[in-house]
Amino acid sequence: MPRYFFTKLNPPRASFAQDMNDEERRLMGEHAVYWKALAEKGVALLFGPVGDPKGVYGICITQVENPEEIHSLTTNDPVIRAGLGFTVETYPMPDIVRGR
């Protein structure tokens, strides 16, 4: 039975979206490609940035078979592997309601 998780990607600094350098911008492009591929497979149901006035961060809702799978997905994200200072928070969603 699939399990759903909410994941929050916290950037290394509140101003990251406004002042990322070329290397960070390149890695964010790889990050987007990575999650888009997972969306096309039906694993990432939705993902994207949240425009919080205190600092932009990313969210994702995933559908996986087991909790270990979400850990693997987040640790293999290019921005996490690169060690840029991002942190990840992942929480199970035990009961969801899906629309069409």
Model-derived regions: residue spans:
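Conserved, structured core segments of small domains
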Residues: 1-100
